[in-house]
Each structure stands twice: as C-alpha cells, then as structure tokens.
From Swiss-Prot:
Native organism taxonomy: Bacteria, Bacillati, Bacillota, Bacilli, Bacillales
Name of protein: Galactose-6-phosphate isomerase subunit LacB
Binding partners and assembly: Heteromultimeric protein consisting of LacA and LacB.
Species assigned in the record: Staphylococcus aureus (strain bovine RF122 / ET3-1)
Domain of life: Bacteria
Protein's UniProt keywords contain Mitochondrion: no
MF (Gene Ontology): galactose-6-phosphate isomerase activity; ribose-5-phosphate isomerase activity
Pathway terms, separated by semicolons: Carbohydrate metabolism; D-galactose 6-phosphate degradation; D-tagatose 6-phosphate from D-galactose 6-phosphate: step 1/1
EC number of this enzyme: 5.3.1.26
The keyword Isomerase belongs to this UniProt entry's keyword annotation: yes
Amino acid sequence: MKIALGCDHIVTDTKMRVSEFLKSKGHEVIDVGTYDFTRTHYPIFGKKVGEQVVSGNADLGVCICGTGVGINNAVNKVPGVRSALVRDMTSALYAKEELNANVIGFGGRIIGELLMCDIIDAFINAEYKPTEENKKLIAKIKHLETRNADQADPHFFDEFLEKWDRGEYHD
C-alpha cells in the first residue's frame, strides 16, 4: 500500500521512524516532508499529504506534528480528505471502519512511537464497513466541503438529531 507521510520540524525524527516502520511492513512511503529540524509550518505538509491521498497517488495518509491538532486541521481542509486525530486504537478503528477515514493524524509529542506505529498498522489493516447510516453521514460531511445554501439551513442535520431524540443511537 502507498502511504503519504508528512510532518513539521518538531517531529521529523518521529516521522523518519514511522517511515522505517511502514517500509518494514512492505508499504511504499511517499514522504512529503519536512526533512529536517528547520522551523517550518505544518499546513504545508498537511496539504501535501491530503493532495497525495485525494489524487490517488497514495492510498492513505499519516500526518504528525507536535500535538497533531494543527496538521490534522490543515489536512482536513483538502477536499476529499477525512482525517482523524487519534491517540488510541479505538478512535483510529472507528475513524476507518465507520467514517472511511483516509488520513490519520498524531501528536508526536503526545503519543509514543511504538503505540503510534501499532495504531497506524491497525488503521491500515482495518476496513471500512459501509452501512446506510455511515454512507449518509459521510455524504453530509462531504457536503460541507463546498459552501452552499443547504449548509445555512438550520435544519441541515435534523434527520440525525431526530434519530437521536428517538433513541436510535446507542453508545
């Protein structure tokens, strides 16, 4: 599988070890940078990862910055990206299996490398489990990528709120 991998200057060392891990698992890594510790800006590399994924050059993407918050916000601005910032296996699997996430984000200063690699491996090997409900939710998320009149409608999510009120969602 082809995995796009990007980071900011704070976690270049972490990214390099993740790259080595992915290669050891037989994956092709598309390293979009950064490549050293010179101060840079995470949105550049979040965007590059997202573009590799939505163009089809990469199957999935991994973004890492200090907390993961900034680069994950940046990659989610690329139309077609569904990225989740995760720190645990449960969140990563939910993102892939239920929301068909195609990018995963991490805080390299928040989570240890070994756990990060385990989560990435599980994310890559997990499969999206399409249901009618998941498809509708993903369609609503996708609809938000383009500003349009429907989003201004205060009833945009009513269908899902009504199901909540009827007790159809369970944790």
